[in-house]
Amino acid sequence: LALAGISVADTAPSSAAPAVLANVKAGETTRMVYELEAKAYVLFIPATGRAHFDVEMRPDTYNIKSRVKVTGIADWFVNYDMHLQASGYTRGDELKTYNYVSQNRDGKKNRRVNLTITDKDFSMTANPVFGNLGEPPATTEQVLKTNDPITALITFALEPRAPGADPCGGPLRIFDGRQLTYLHLKNAGTKQI
């Protein structure tokens, strides 16, 4: 088992991130492309994960396309290749999920999940269907307070924070069509990596 991650926080009061969503809402279409790579060892096998995010934000809507894949020798043992797409609404201080599609190409189930969240309800289809939806499954009230995984990540990076406030903010509320997750981040300070 291996775990790799990166956390970056800017606690400066004049951070440019809050301005991004405000500028988009004011009419400035913005496109961002993120490329991430993480390396770890699983037992003695080097594992590399790559993620690509293409984010386009317009004054009222946004669209995110992403691909996450394990590469190298680890790909022989862990066939993880996920294509993700999310779209929704641009608000002054956040993005809000309307539709999320994930297509897992793992060579086994190759599951496709389609999630739609409205102001009052949500619907989800999975093919093949999930064996269960968690115990207990997420309620409509819980899901309406969430975003899909990639929207939650991008919103976290862009949401405004008051000067001196915890740069990690509150929990990230995430729903992927099956699992409800409240991800609590902890500020570990600035580190030289």
Predicted regions and their residues:
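A broad structural signal for short, well-ordered beta-strand segments within beta-sheet-rich domains
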Residues: 94-99, 121-123
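Solvent-exposed helix/loop surface patches that form functional interfaces
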Residues: 29, 110-193
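Sec-dependent N-terminal signal peptides
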Residues: 1-3
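N-terminal cleavable signal peptides for secretion/export
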Residues: 5-93, 100-110
